[in-house]
Amino acid sequence: MGIKGLAQVLSEHAPASVKHNDIKNYFGRKVAIDASMSLYQFLIQVRSQDGQQLMNEQGETTSHLMGMFYRTLRIVDNGIKPCFVFDGKPPTLKSGELAKRVARHQKAREDQEETKEVGTAEMVDRFAKRTVKVTRQHNDEAKRLLELMGIPFVNAPCEAEAQCAALARSGKVYAAASEDMDTLCFQAPVLLRHLTFSEQRKEPISEYNIEKALNGLDMSVEQFVDLCILLGCDYCEPIRGVGPARAVELIRQYGTLDRFVKEADRSKYPIPEDWPYEDARRLFLDAEVLPGEEIELKWKSPDADGIIQFLVKEKGFNEDRVKLGINRLEKASKTIPQGRLDSFFKPVPSSPKKPVDTKSKGSAKRKRDSNKGGESKKKR
């Protein structure tokens, strides 16, 4: 779900924190991509003309593999070095949101069966997309494909977005890429959205900078996280009557959620009983992640035979197209630079100016003058 209305808040209150770039602007960058979000996106978007998920002759879903293969090709074609991060176990606090999702899936399946009988094609498609769920098999097959492609991946102990943010904070990658805005709550220095969208959508990459967001909002990291919880996140249900504008106003008025919960008018703001905002805050500020510094990311040459065996012989992909994709991978692995030039230069703190030693400067000048005189004598 992410954070409700956060993109709107940043565009209004911290416009300098948001910019939109062409994918080519990220040539030479390393990016950690939320694989679980990407797979969900592929299962929804990569479909046949009749709106159904792609399948092979055995009836196995292949939308996730088609998306992972060709969207990753587009990324490496543009000189980006991706690594993918997969979800681990969900935090206990997320069980409420997960239960709601299961209920929504079940309701959507029932509605889908009804609309197949009496509804339009558009209605059937809409309800079909609500039933999408990323399974362990989808994850395992995506990991197998990435390994064959020579693209590194990381198994996060918990939330993939949090691990992407940790990799970006450690400097192992330039940015975290996800459609979930809560990646910023995990203190990703830079968040990229729309990186794994199809080229046909012609969507620019939206880049969010956390430091500029905090400056624009005039908030600390803790206040920003409190704001996001108040907006509504996966860990806490939103408070009725509190939209984006009101949430910003309340954090500025009370400073913290602690004061808001303690002092706010409950008749005006019906805060749920046992509202776990403190636990949510802790999950954002102290997420369970692998230390980014200890993770080694290695990009390798693709295993052409392995890719053909998996995608063509096992999953029924078109062999000619897959071979063209392999050629693109091999070309990218040879041409993508180790790093951008600007990554080698870090700002150096300016040292205080030293007082000018006029005496030594004068003596140096006299020495230069005498040398010049000596040289001119020699020339004569």
Curated annotation (Swiss-Prot):
A Pfam match is XPG_N
Ranges where the record places region Disordered: 340-380
Task: Provide the binding site for DNA.
Answer: 47, 71, 159, 232, 234
Q: What is its EC number?
A: 3.1.-.-
Q: What is its main location?
A: nucleus
Q: Which PROSITE patterns match?
A: XPG_1, XPG_2
Phosphoserine: residues carrying this PTM:
350-351
Q: Where does Mg(2+) 1 bind?
A: 34, 87, 159, 161
Q: Which UniProt keywords apply?
A: DNA damage, DNA repair, DNA replication, Endonuclease, Exonuclease, Hydrolase, Magnesium, Metal-binding, Mitochondrion, Nuclease, Nucleus, Phosphoprotein
| Binding sites annotated in the UniProt record for Mg(2+) 2 | 180, 182, 234
Cofactor details (free text): Binds 2 magnesium ions per subunit. They probably participate in the reaction catalyzed by the enzyme. May bind an additional third magnesium ion after substrate binding.
Q: Which GO terms describe its molecular function?
A: 5'-3' DNA exonuclease activity; 5'-3' exonuclease activity; 5'-flap endonuclease activity; DNA binding; double-stranded DNA 5'-3' DNA exonuclease activity; magnesium ion binding; single-stranded DNA 5'-3' DNA exonuclease activity
Low complexity bias locations: 342-353
Could you tell me the superkingdom of the organism this chain comes from? Eukaryota
Q: Where is this region: I-domain?
A: 123-254
Location within or outside the cell? Nucleus, Nucleolus; Nucleus, Nucleoplasm; Mitochondrion
Q: Which family does it belong to?
A: Belongs to the XPG/RAD2 endonuclease family. FEN1 subfamily.
Q: What does this protein do?
A: Structure-specific nuclease with 5'-flap endonuclease and 5'-3' exonuclease activities involved in DNA replication and repair. During DNA replication, cleaves the 5'-overhanging flap structure that is generated by displacement synthesis when DNA polymerase encounters the 5'-end of a downstream Okazaki fragment. It enters the flap from the 5'-end and then tracks to cleave the flap base, leaving a nick for ligation. Also involved in the long patch base excision repair (LP-BER) pathway, by cleaving within the apurinic/apyrimidinic (AP) site-terminated flap.
Name this polypeptide is given: Flap endonuclease 1
Q: Which organism is it from?
A: Schizosaccharomyces pombe (strain 972 / ATCC 24843)
